[in-house]
């Protein structure tokens, strides 16, 4: 079974495989889409040991997430007796064969594409303001037989924002998140050749900037979620004789990943758990 990923818009090729190949289970991990590739199963998660299939890119074992979808020609899945007969114990959990694009006989063909994408949260909850939080806290303490935490004067200060430094009303989502995340995907390919030499060359630059608002308080440090990747590939096919063809595959992968000191999960947990009246900005 083969599939083509050129029409998929996910960043990680492993995530792009969802729903494309019969018998392949794709489990996307938590966190941002560029932080974690998917976990792949062919025979299912049936043991305590590794259930990951063997992934071969042009015959060599490597992660599929090191590639860009633009350079992938096709993906095949081998399982059961076929996988074990060809690859032995290494193919016990199935085999995923990835073929990258190659040159063909003909005039040079050059393509260039640019994609700009934006994404926004589908739905964000509306949290209680500082005054509502203070009222709810007073009610909770009274229900427990305790004295109210805030007096009437303090409640008025929350409501009217008379002293915001002492009785704050902070919208943590608005303070921490942008309305949109942005990304660029630039792709350049050239392919062609003669009956003796055929070539395929690709340059792919991917840049994604997340929802967190960047800060400029400290030079050289940014809290923004950012993922940049440059992929360079050249595949050569050289026909030496009618019975001999030499293949040369070159791949370069350069990645820059910037994130805050905490994980994405912890950041959003804090945004959802810290009350608006806890402390000022």
Language model regions located:
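Short, small/polar-rich motifs associated with maturation and membrane association
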Residues: 1-234, 240, 245-247
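Outer-membrane beta-barrel and related beta-rich outer-membrane complex signature
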Residues: 121-130, 211-215, 247-278
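Extended ligand-binding clefts on enzyme/binding-domain cores
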Residues: 59, 279-280
């Amino acid at each position: 079974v083969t599939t083509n990923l050129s029409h998929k818009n996910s960043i990680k090729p492993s995530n792009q495989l969802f729903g494309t190949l019969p018998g392949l289970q794709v489990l996307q991990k938590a966190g941002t889409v560029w932080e974690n590739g998917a976990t792949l199963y062919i025979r299912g998660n049936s043991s305590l040991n590794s259930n990951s299939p063997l992934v071969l890119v042009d015959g060599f074992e490597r992660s599929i997430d090191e590639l860009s979808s633009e350079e992938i020609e096709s993906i095949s899945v081998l399982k059961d007796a076929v996988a074990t007969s060809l690859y032995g114990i290494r193919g016990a959990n199935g085999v995923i064969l990835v073929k990258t694009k190659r040159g063909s006989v003909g005039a040079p063909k050059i393509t260039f594409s640019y994609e700009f994408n934006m994404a926004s949260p589908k739905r964000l909850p509306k949290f209680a303001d500082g005054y509502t939080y203070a009222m709810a806290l007073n009610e909770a303490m009274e229900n427990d037989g305790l004295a109210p935490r805030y007096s009437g004067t303090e409640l008025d200060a929350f409501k009217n924002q008379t002293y915001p430094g002492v009785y704050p009303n902070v919208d943590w989502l608005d303070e921490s998140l942008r309305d949109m995340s942005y990304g660029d995907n630039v792709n350049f390919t050239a392919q062609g050749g003669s009956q003796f030499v055929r070539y395929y060359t690709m340059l792919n630059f991917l840049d994604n900037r997340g929802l967190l608002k960047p800060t400029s308080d400290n030079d050289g440090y940014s809290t923004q979620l950012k993922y940049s990747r440059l992929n360079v590939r050249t595949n050569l096919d050289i026909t030496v004789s009618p019975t001999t063809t030499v293949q040369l595959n070159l791949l370069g992968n350069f990645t820059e990943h910037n994130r805050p000191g905490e994980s994405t999960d912890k950041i959003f947990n804090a945004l959802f758990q810290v009350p608006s009246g806890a402390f000022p900005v």
